[in-house]
């Protein structure tokens, strides 16, 4: 299973709220909902998040063996 828990940890570390992400970076609420519920996202979206947050993929997601 893919977990996006590191994404929220990265936001905390960088002191970025989800509101600020939506407002300043045009990240949709739908995307945040997908991340919150560990639903799939595209590699393009993953790339965009890494660019926006200036981070690596492992700062966005992690693999957890079922």
Question: Where do the model's predicted regions map?
Answer:
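Residue-level detection of the helix-turn-helix DNA-binding "recognition helix"
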Residues: 12, 23, 37, 62-65
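Short alpha-helical DNA-recognition segment
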Residues: 15-33
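Residues within the helices of the helix-turn-helix
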Residues: 19, 47, 58
